Amino acid sequence: GFLSTVKNLATNVAGTVLDTIRCKVTGGCRP
């Protein structure tokens, strides 16, 4: 349903943001 789609999107965005922050903090960025 719509709510589950929104939840999945939010989870994906949160994961991407966390990965970006971790990448900047550790300096272990990979293209």
Curated annotation (Swiss-Prot):
Keyword Transcription: no
Expression sites by tissue: Expressed by the skin glands.
Chief location: secreted
UniProt subcellular location: Secreted
GO cellular component term, pick one: extracellular region
Keywords: Amphibian defense peptide, Antibiotic, Antimicrobial, Disulfide bond, Secreted
Disulfide bridges in this chain: C23-C29
Pfam family, one: Antimicrobial_2
An individual GO BP term: defense response to Gram-negative bacterium
Family, similarity comment: Belongs to the frog skin active peptide (FSAP) family. Brevinin subfamily.
Biological function: Antimicrobial activity against Gram-negative bacterium E.coli.
Name of the protein this chain belongs to: Palustrin-2a
